[in-house]
């Protein structure tokens, strides 16, 4: 659903931020 899509996007963004902040 729409809420699920948002949650997925947020998870992807958080993962990318985690990767960036590691470097």
Swiss-Prot record:
One of its GO terms (molecular function) is oxygen carrier activity. Its main location: secreted. One of its GO terms (cellular component) is extracellular region. It comes from the Eukaryota. Keywords: Copper, Oxygen transport, Secreted, Transport. The keyword Iron does not apply. Transmembrane segments: none annotated. Hemolymph. It is found in: Secreted, Extracellular space. Hemocyanins are copper-containing oxygen carriers occurring freely dissolved in the hemolymph of many mollusks and arthropods. Belongs to the tyrosinase family. Hemocyanin subfamily. This is Hemocyanin subunit 4. It comes from Carcinus maenas.
């Amino acid at each position: 659903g729409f809420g699920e899509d948002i949650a997925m996007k947020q998870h992807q963004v958080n993962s990318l931020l985690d990767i960036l902040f590691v470097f």
